[in-house]
Amino acid sequence: MAKNKIDSKLDTVVILAGGLGTRLAEETKKKPKPMVEIGRKPILWHIIKHYEHYGFKNIIICAGYKGEMIKKFFKKNIFKDIKINVLDTGLNSLTARRLIKVKKLLPENFCLTYGDAVADINIKKLVKFHFDKNSIFTISGVIPVSKYGSIKYDRSNKITKFMEKSDFIDNFVSGGYFVLNKKIFKFINDKKNLMLEKEPMTNIAKTGKMYIYKHYGFWQCMDTLRDKLYLEDLWKKNLRWKIWQN
């Protein structure tokens, strides 16, 4: 087994790619958010290249808004050694419902991510952590880099320190790279249109079977046009998330 490849127990990733992307309206009027390009390739392509690097062979894309554009793109057989299944999971479905709609295609453990963020996270280590902890829901925790100046001040509101574009924020946030066990479906009411990130995850956390895998490397989401331009600039100057060879 190549050193970067994952354990054969887990080779499936679900990518949530059906949202409207309203904060990136300049681009998403014409295409779904996961098809917005970075370096002349859809961000969805970058995400799949990342998982391909770690040996994933089964990709399930939960499409919705303008999903036909995603299907058309992957009909070109860009990834010859990977099975890519693009499924229409509904225009207005929230994340938990999208997952419910592909449940029958899922193995006991699987990866889940969003179609709008890139990172240099080590998926092999993330998966190993998931199994080592006997977790049913593993979240990648990331420390987002601020693009704004950070201000520190005292009780009188006098500024004591100003840091331009601070590289550190105290709290981890969800990086959107998950490993899940199918036991999580016990916490999803399939009769409701739910956000996975709200009631289901809140209740799973109470079981003591949810863990955070801390990632200190690069991570960046693409929520706005500013984010897209930032990633375009990085692609030209510093390919921080490109861990694959070609």
Name every feature range the model reports, one short phrase each:
Residues I60-C62, Y114, T138-G141, K214:
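Short beta-strand segments
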Residues F110-C111, V118, K124-V127, F131, ...:
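Catalytic-core segments of class I nucleotidyltransferases/pyrophosphorylases
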Residues L44, I70, V102, D116, ...:
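Residue-level signal for inorganic ion chemistry
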